[in-house]
UniProtKB/Swiss-Prot annotation:
It catalyses: 3-methyl-2-oxobutanoate + (6R)-5,10-methylene-5,6,7,8-tetrahydrofolate + H2O = 2-dehydropantoate + (6S)-5,6,7,8-tetrahydrofolate. One of its GO terms (molecular function) is 3-methyl-2-oxobutanoate hydroxymethyltransferase activity. Its EC number is 2.1.2.11. CDD domains: KPHMT-like. Homodecamer; pentamer of dimers. NCBIfam families: panB, PRK00311.1. This is 3-methyl-2-oxobutanoate hydroxymethyltransferase. It is an enzyme of class 2 (transferase). Its main location: cytoplasm. It comes from Mesorhizobium japonicum (strain LMG 29417 / CECT 9101 / MAFF 303099).
Length: 286
């Protein structure tokens, strides 16, 4: 059954997300394309145009392959494909770290060129100034603490956070700094479960967990991981709700066989002369 085109602006805004603290868990997924946004929009509260797009769709080894132009292009596609979900666009590495002024300029460009509801950036105490400046400019901003994909090269890989008293204290400081700076919510990624749960209890803005805790105020996964489309190793925290790898591989195998034995295209997939509909997409022949 075809998904209806979005026709009415009934967007969930950042303020509504903020008010969901402690309520029914927020449902969040990444989206990078128009058709996927259309399919997900009726079921989620928030769509994140994550810089993971550089890995998932563009084949880069890390999220550092994302550029501002790339994020804007995918943000535009997701906005076109959705009508209800709050759309948040990641600020890629290199677009905000240098100064508050740089962060505001990049955030404003993202919002102006996509129409998205908010932006997201990585970092806690060290990025509080950037978060505060973006929020002061009237642009809703989501924080991101814990495992920071943009810092994996500096950190020596994807390391779980919160294993020592020192790192637990640092995570709590990051969460409080993000909250105080004016973020409307914060992603907590790749932490010890009890630490994420404690942070959730101690701060007043919603926490969105990914490899964190079921006690977070919401959960997010990369869409390709969730539907079983990821072709490389899938993180432990992912639950696959479908197996699109097999669906696509089997469809390609069947298509190849039918092309080679000339059973495709069949009579119903070609135009039969004067009685053919003039509509390329089909229609009754008369």
């Amino acid at each position: 059954m075809a998904t209806k085109l979005p026709t009415t602006d009934i967007r969930i805004g950042a303020e509504l997300i903020r008010r969901r603290k402690g309520g029914v868990p927020l449902v969040c997924l990444t989206a990078y394309t128009y058709p996927v946004a259309r399919l997900l929009d009726p079921h989620v509260d928030l769509l994140l145009v994550g810089d993971s797009v550089s890995m998932v769709l563009h084949g880069h080894a890390t999220t550092l392959g994302a550029s501002l132009g790339m994020m804007i292009a995918h943000g535009q596609a997701v906005m076109r494909g959705s009508a209800r979900a709050c759309v948040v666009v990641d600020m890629p590495a290199g677009s905000y770290e240098d100064s508050a002024a740089q962060a505001v300029a990049s955030a404003r460009r993202i919002v102006d060129e996509t129409g998205c509801q908010a932006v997201k950036l990585e970092g806690g105490v060290d990025m509080a100034g950037q978060i505060a400046a973006i929020a002061a400019a009237g642009i809703p901003v989501m924080g991101h603490i814990g495992l920071l994909p943009q810092s994996v090269e500096k950190d020596g890989g994807y390391k779980i956070k919160g294993r020592t008293d020192e790192t637990v204290a640092a995570l709590m400081a990051d969460a409080r700094a993000v909250e105080k700076a004016g973020a409307f919510s914060v992603v907590i990624e790749g932490t010890i479960e009890a630490v994420a749960a404690d942070i959730t209890r101690r701060i007043a803005i919603p926490t969105i967990g990914i490899g964190a805790s079921g006690d977070c105020d919401g959960q997010i996964l990369v869409i390709d991981d969730m539907v079983g489309l990821t072709v490389d190793r899938v993180p432990k925290f992912v639950k696959e709700y479908a197996d699109l790898r097999s669906v696509i591989a089997n469809a390609a195998e069947r298509y190849a066989a039918e092309v080679r034995d000339r059973t495709f295209p069949g009579p119903s997939h070609v135009f039969s002369g004067s009685k053919a509909s003039s509509d390329l997409n089909g229609g009754d022949e008369s």
